[in-house]
Amino acid sequence: MKLLASPFLLLLPVMLMSMVFSSPNPGVARSHGDQHLAPRRWLLEGGQECECKDWFLQAPKRKATAVLGPPRKQCPCDHVKGREKKNRHQKHHRKSQRPSRACQQFLKRCHLASFALPL
């Protein structure tokens, strides 16, 4: 009986920690994964107002037009930062040419949607 109880007692703290870190209650504990929910939440709430095909065809930037009604959110890939003016401290202040995390998730979702077969 003692042999069966000792492995269970060793696994008990691990199980409790995994339950605490995966808790949906934000007041209990937050794991590092919770920090990345904001872009995903933005995408799930319908923040995407652009079409996937625009990004895969490398369409030119759309001009902002005045639209009556509630303001629309822009595509997450509209704000990719370009190169900045060179300065003498360029090595220390390089900006990443990578798109933002929200843009990467948007492109990944569009890419996966392009593989989806119509029913």
From Swiss-Prot:
Q: Name one GO molecular function term.
A: chemokine activity
Subcellular localization, per the record?
A: Secreted
**Can you say what this protein is called?**
C-X-C motif chemokine 17
Deletion phenotype: Mice show no defects in breeding or gross anatomy development, and they gained weight normally but exhibit a paucity of macrophages in the lungs.
Keywords attached to this Swiss-Prot or TrEMBL record, sorted alphabetically, are:
Angiogenesis, Chemotaxis, Cleavage on pair of basic residues, Developmental protein, Differentiation, Disulfide bond, Secreted, Signal
| Disulfide bond sites | C75-C103, C77-C110
**Tissue distribution:** Detected in lung, trachea, lung, tongue thyroid, submaxillary gland, epididymis, and uterus tissues and at a lower level in ovary, prostate and in intestinal tissues.
Q: Which gene encodes it?
A: Cxcl17
Q: Where is this site: Cleavage?
A: K63, A64
The UniProt regions of compositional bias labelled Basic residues, in chain numbering, are 82-98
Hey, which family's this protein in? Belongs to the intercrine alpha (chemokine CxC) family.
